[in-house]
């Protein structure tokens, strides 16, 4: 069902993931299109990359078994917290006209999801601060290991974080330090949320002006836009 060998590995994984869900007999698959990511106030805009944003369109056109179940591939905007619950209610009502859920139910679930996301991001930053303080206290080098969210997956990162730690360095991720920077000028159009984090993490390292603090950017799967991000991060 994969239409192109040039699709990145995470995109290819989605085919198997959806097939596995269908094999388990689920009555619906929720995989929405998301043009925008959350606005972290670091860039000129806050798009998702085209694969993240629109791959549900590819999935719905290439996995024939989806025709036999409910596929929720509608366009949603998680960045619009104020009207997301209403939009989500309309989508769910369209797919499940006889569902017993109410607008209040969807609002409650949405609020809980946003609260959990905010809690998670605060935890990531707090742990980052903890390990930065540890490195300062023990005079250890710091590596900001910067990449995309999928690099957290052990299947993809192959334990490079542990390898760096075994070399005596303290590792933190780009989303643990990017928040320490304000929006700043870049040489390229800074319009993707994940890229904005990369650039902010690189600036954080430069602003520290400490030779013990360095950045490693992980680049995988021949991602086309990383031809741009790598030059900007290096610059």
Where are these regions (language model features)?
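An N-terminal assembly and electron-transfer interface module characteristic of large anaerobic redox
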Residues: 1-235
């Amino acid at each position: 069902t994969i239409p192109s060998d040039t699709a990145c590995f995470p995109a290819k994984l989605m085919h198997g993931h959806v097939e596995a869900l269908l094999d388990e007999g689920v009555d619906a698959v929720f995989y929405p299109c998301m043009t925008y990511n959350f606005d972290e106030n670091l860039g000129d805009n806050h798009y998702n990359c085209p694969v993240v944003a629109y791959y549900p369109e590819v999935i719905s056109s290439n996995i024939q078994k989806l025709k036999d179940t409910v596929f929720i591939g509608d366009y949603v905007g998680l960045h619009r917290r104020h009207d997301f619950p209403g939009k989500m209610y309309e989508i769910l009502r369209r797919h499940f006209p006889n569902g017993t859920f109410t607008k209040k139910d969807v609002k409650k679930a949405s609020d809980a999801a946003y609260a959990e996301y905010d809690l998670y991001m605060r935890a990531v930053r707090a742990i980052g601060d903890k390990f930065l303080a540890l490195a300062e206290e023990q005079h250890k080098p710091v590596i900001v290991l910067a990449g995309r969210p999928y690099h957290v997956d052990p299947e993809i990162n192959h334990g490079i974080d542990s390898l760096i730690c075994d070399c005596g360095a303290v590792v933190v991720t780009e989303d643990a330090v990017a928040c320490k920077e304000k929006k700043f000028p870049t040489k390229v159009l800074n319009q993707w949320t994940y890229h904005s984090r990369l650039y902010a993490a690189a600036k954080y390292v430069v602003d520290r002006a400490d030779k013990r603090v360095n950045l490693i950017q992980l680049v995988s799967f021949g991602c086309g836009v990383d031809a741009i991000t790598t030059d900007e991060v290096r610059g």
